């Protein structure tokens, strides 16, 4: 009975099935790794003093005791030439005591020793040239083990032999997988278990192969010192959140908290999302050196124990995108935690403070005994259906919900008020306006004899009669509800009520093949089993291109749509600028104002070698549309405003389900 509620709450969960690789089974990274890395602040210019002072700060500032233990020296540590025996060595001007001594220093502090290398012939950041590990994997793995290294971050520069080993090649002639596999296998031959962090920049959809080789993998290109980078990165995370789990973590890149780039609310958003998406939490700021010390506000963000606990939760399940309101400038991500808890994040993309509401059904819930607002430091109790709070510009309402009731379930003791034989249930949620909701009334004791009860809602002027057979504890009926969270249901009966369950209509699906195309749009047949559930898609939706259909509705009002779309426009080169991993779509009903949604990536196959190059993988998001009337309605899927974005073409369109 609750299945359909779960389906419409988990709005981003509909994706083409992919056979994913099993994780590397070695007992490491059962929760995402935490630590500190030189790169974000010091680029490729680290030295021994920098690493040691920041490592000491991890301890002195209380960060290591919270889990930040891996200390990694990124690019800039080695030299152009190997030793006569072919082994790696360090730059002894920058690291006069040497890397083994650095490892001893870190281990004496109770920290873990991380090094950086590259799967190419040179390290990223060359020139000045620093030798890479390509063709030297076994020897370098032995060297790392002899230095008592605890983790290896393994990059992807200067690696494509077929094109002359360029610094960067986002479309290499072959998948990066074999190069990372070579180092993974070499590490596994050592007598020391080493955390392997794969840094392939999201090339060739590593979620399909990296979990079998390493403990984390970069989902995309580097984080950049600008607020827009957050939207770009989480759009790339969206289609692979279900892959996260013990020993296999999608890496959203190192943290910029403390680098004086973001405002405090922006840092809270950044840290919140990385935490609940189960990314490794690797500090990229200068904690303490001769010139710099992290500010207190940023340090407090990094030390927020609840947020760290979300990241390190034993269940190991990532949050996923649930709803996105593009024009209104906010969205909801949510996921499960251990002990039946739920974490939810409501992101305010606008740079001004506003009151935002989380409708609990959007995250699969109807009631929460407690709602803890992490960044506000407040707790609300007995929250029914909706929770509202003020969210700073670019900030996030981060919530922990406990003692919850599943969506669509309304216990009388929580939602009902009784007077005599009349019980009124309040705060009833309706995702769409429809006369086809099913109410199931559960009684706390069997009916002693056949009884006729009446049921009404504020969306219906007359009461509905339903007959309860003798000895029955359940009766169901069809009732109307209006989209929103303020519906009421009134029931008259002498039988004591335990709870009601409310189920929305299944709706009707309209495939893209039923739409009339205009302008630039084209209909394409996909490979067998792809572009689900239709097998075809409409593409090349320019700002003047449309797909139009006439759709019948049984009632007027606002209707909830589930739109199936495809987007694999990955921001590689464009990630340094305004690339966002998103594309635009609009839905217009009866010439009303279009409802716009900027959809994230959906691709779950390699953009270079996979079926359809990732452009056959469907995902789903929901949106509420207005302007519906009883009878026939003109529905237009288009790309209104697309010419104002970075990418003028919209996402590909597969179909829509209208909940009427």
From Swiss-Prot:
UniProt name for this protein: Probable alpha-galactosidase D
Keyword Transferase assigned: no
EC number per UniProt: 3.2.1.22
Keywords in alphabetical order: Carbohydrate metabolism, Disulfide bond, Glycoprotein, Glycosidase, Hydrolase, Polysaccharide degradation, Secreted, Signal
Gene name of the encoded protein: aglD
Disulfide bond positions: 124-157
Leader sequence segment: 1-20
GO CC annotation: extracellular region
GO MF annotations, alphabetized: alpha-galactosidase activity
Family in the record: Belongs to the glycosyl hydrolase 27 family.
One GO biological process term: polysaccharide catabolic process
């Amino acid at each position: 009975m609750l299945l359909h509620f779960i389906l419409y709450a988990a709005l981003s969960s509909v994706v083409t099935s992919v056979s994913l690789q099993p994780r590397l089974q070695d007992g490491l990274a059962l929760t995402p790794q935490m630590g500190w890395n030189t790169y974000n602040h010091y680029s490729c210019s680290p030295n021994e003093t920098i690493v040691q002072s920041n490592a000491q700060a991890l301890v002195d500032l209380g960060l290591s005791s919270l889990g930040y233990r891996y200390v990694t020296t990124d690019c800039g540590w080695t030299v152009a030439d190997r030793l006569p025996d072919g082994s790696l060595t360090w730059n002894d001007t920058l690291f006069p005591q040497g890397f083994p001594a650095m490892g001893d220093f870190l281990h004496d502090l109770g920290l873990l020793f991380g090094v950086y290398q590259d799967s190419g012939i040179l390290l990223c950041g060359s020139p000045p040239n620093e030798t890479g590990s390509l063709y030297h994997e076994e020897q370098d793995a032995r060297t790392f083990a002899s230095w008592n290294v605890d983790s290896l971050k393994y990059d992807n520069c200067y690696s494509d032999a077929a094109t002359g080993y360029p610094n960067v090649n986002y479309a290499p002639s072959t998948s990066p997988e074999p190069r990372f596999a070579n180092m993974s296998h070499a590490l596994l031959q050592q007598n020391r278990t080493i955390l392997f962090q794969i840094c392939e920049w999201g090339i060739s959809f590593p979620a399909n192969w990296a979990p079998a080789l390493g403990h984390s993998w970069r989902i995309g290109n580097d984080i950049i010192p600008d607020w827009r980078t957050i939207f770009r990165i989480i759009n790339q995370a969206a289609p692979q959140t279900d892959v996260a789990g013990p020993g296999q973590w999608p890496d959203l890149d190192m943290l910029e908290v403390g680098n004086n780039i973001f405002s405090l609310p922006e840092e809270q958003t950044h840290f919140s999302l990385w935490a609940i998406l189960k990314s490794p939490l690797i500090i990229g700021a200068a904690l303490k050196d001769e010139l710099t010390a992290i500010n207190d506000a940023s340090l407090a963000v990094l030390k927020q124990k609840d947020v760290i606990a979300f990241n390190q939760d034993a269940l190991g399940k990532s949050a996923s995108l649930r709803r996105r309101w593009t024009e209104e400038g906010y969205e909801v991500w949510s996921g499960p935690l251990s002990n039946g808890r739920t974490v939810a994040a409501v992101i305010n993309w606008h740079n001004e403070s506003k009151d935002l509401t989380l409708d609990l059904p959007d995250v699969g819930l109807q009631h929460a005994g407690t709602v803890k607002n992490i960044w506000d430091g407040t707790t609300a109790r007995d929250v029914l259906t909706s929770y509202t709070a003020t969210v700073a510009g670019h900030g996030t309402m981060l919530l922990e919900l406990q003692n919850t009731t599943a969506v669509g379930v309304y216990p009388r003791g929580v939602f009902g008020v009784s007077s005599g034989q009349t019980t009124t249930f309040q705060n009833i949620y309706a995702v769409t306006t429809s006369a086809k909701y099913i109410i199931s009334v559960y009684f706390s004791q069997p009916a002693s004899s056949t009884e006729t009860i009446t049921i009404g809602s504020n969306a219906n002027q007359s009461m509905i009669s339903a007959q309860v057979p003798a000895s029955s504890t359940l009766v169901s009926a069809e009732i109307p509800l209006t989209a929103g969270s303020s519906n009421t249901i009134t029931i008259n009966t002498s039988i004591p009520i335990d709870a009601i369950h409310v189920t929305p209509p299944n709706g009707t699906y309209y495939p893209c093949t039923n739409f009339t195309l205009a302008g630039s749009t084209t209909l394409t047949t996909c490979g067998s089993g792809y572009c689900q559930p239709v097998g075809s898609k409409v593409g090349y939706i320019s700002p003047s291109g449309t797909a139009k259909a006439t759709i019948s509705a049984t009632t007027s009002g606002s209707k909830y749509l589930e739109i199936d779309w495809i987007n694999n426009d990955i921001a590689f080169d464009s990630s340094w600028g305004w690339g966002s991993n998103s594309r635009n779509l609009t839905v217009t009903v009866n010439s009303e104002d279009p409802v716009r949604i900027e959809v994230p990536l959906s691709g779950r196959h390699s953009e270079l070698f996979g079926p359809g190059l990732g452009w056959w993988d469907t995902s789903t998001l929901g949106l509420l549309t207005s302007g519906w009337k009883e009878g026939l309605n003109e529905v237009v899927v288009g790309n209104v405003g697309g010419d104002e974005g970075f990418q003028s073409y919209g996402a590909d369109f597969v179909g829509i389900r209208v909940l009427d």
